[in-house]
Amino acid sequence: MKPSVILYKALPDDLLQRLQEHFTVHQVANLSPQTVEQNAAIFAEAEGLLGSNENVDAALLEKMPKLRATSTISVGYDNFDVDALTARKILLMHTPTVLTETVADTLMALVLSTARRVVEVAERVKAGEWTASIGPDWYGTDVHHKTLGIVGMGRIGMALAQRAHFGFNMPILYNARRHHKEAEERFNARYCNLDTLLQESDFVCLILPLTDETHHLFGAEQFAKMKSSAIFINAGRGPVVDENALIAALQKGEIHAAGLDVFEQEPLSVDSPLLSMANVVAVPHIGSATHETRYGMAACAVDNLIDALQGKVEKNCVNPHVAD
């Protein structure tokens, strides 16, 4: 008999078929307590779990005594209780490499659109305000040769640095847990402490996962240290930033603009002050949202679950020691 798995995110037909070749697949709409209660027998027998954008916590795991592996269609896993999974010897798989280039493209798009005021001036054109040759009130700021500060020099940080260095001749500063020799050799990137990065960068790009240590890492103190002409970009996790402090910094002119793909609460409330600011580009967590990349992530997640339930955890496993 095939192992039973629960799928809580729709898959393309070919990937669903691949999953069904290996498992008995039960599809549910979400992982809410109501869904779990209504499908208690299925959850009790499931050995695998696959999907995204739902919390997997100790309470859910209590309902899934046979669970051996869970696979998320994402690189981030802050909605998983890793300690609870590990304590129960349940493998957690994710998709860290598939989306690197696409998210770096999104970051660069936010850099360009904020600096050149693309969204703002496009809306002005649509509103009929372009009635003569444009003047300084339509101008943006250059990107080329400006200093880019990257907070978090992982795969995505490296891909962003490549674009900025070779495409825009931008000097690169970075802050990370350790020196990154490849970044320094390939992009002439300079390691510095966070205060120095904030003080010297024209663009500050935040690419950090959400952990207890990074929660509200950026607050009023950090924004006050940035140049008043600086542009802040966040495409990591929303709660790494104190959003009220960001709003205040923008309102007071402590920073020039912001490009945001992530927020403390998602979806962003329609009455958020951020949405009334012309110098803010806010997009709905689209970092990896292309047809090609989202398919690749789903395919990777399917393969990850197949591997995990076959005892193969050489790659893409958050807690591989569970398999020892």
UniProtKB/Swiss-Prot annotation:
The active site is at R237, E266, H285. InterPro entries: D-isomer_2-hydroxyacid_DH, D-isomer_2_OHA_DH_cat_dom, D-isomer_DH_CS, D-isomer_DH_NAD-bd, Glyo/OHPyrv_Rdtase_B, NAD(P)-bd_dom_sf. It holds the Pfam family 2-Hacid_dh_C. Keywords: Cytoplasm, NAD, NADP, Oxidoreductase. The keyword GTP-binding does not apply. It is an enzyme of class 1 (oxidoreductase). GO terms for cellular component: cytosol; plasma membrane. GO terms for molecular function: glyoxylate reductase (NADPH) activity; hydroxypyruvate reductase (NADH) activity; hydroxypyruvate reductase (NADPH) activity; NAD binding. It comes from the Bacteria. Its main location: cytoplasm. It catalyses: glycolate + NADP(+) = glyoxylate + NADPH + H(+); (R)-glycerate + NAD(+) = 3-hydroxypyruvate + NADH + H(+); (R)-glycerate + NADP(+) = 3-hydroxypyruvate + NADPH + H(+). Coiled coil: none annotated. Its EC number is 1.1.1.79, 1.1.1.81. It is found in: Cytoplasm. Belongs to the D-isomer specific 2-hydroxyacid dehydrogenase family. GhrB subfamily. Homodimer. Catalyzes the NADPH-dependent reduction of glyoxylate and hydroxypyruvate into glycolate and glycerate, respectively. This is Glyoxylate/hydroxypyruvate reductase B. The lineage of its organism: Bacteria, Pseudomonadati, Pseudomonadota, Gammaproteobacteria, Enterobacterales. The gene is ghrB.
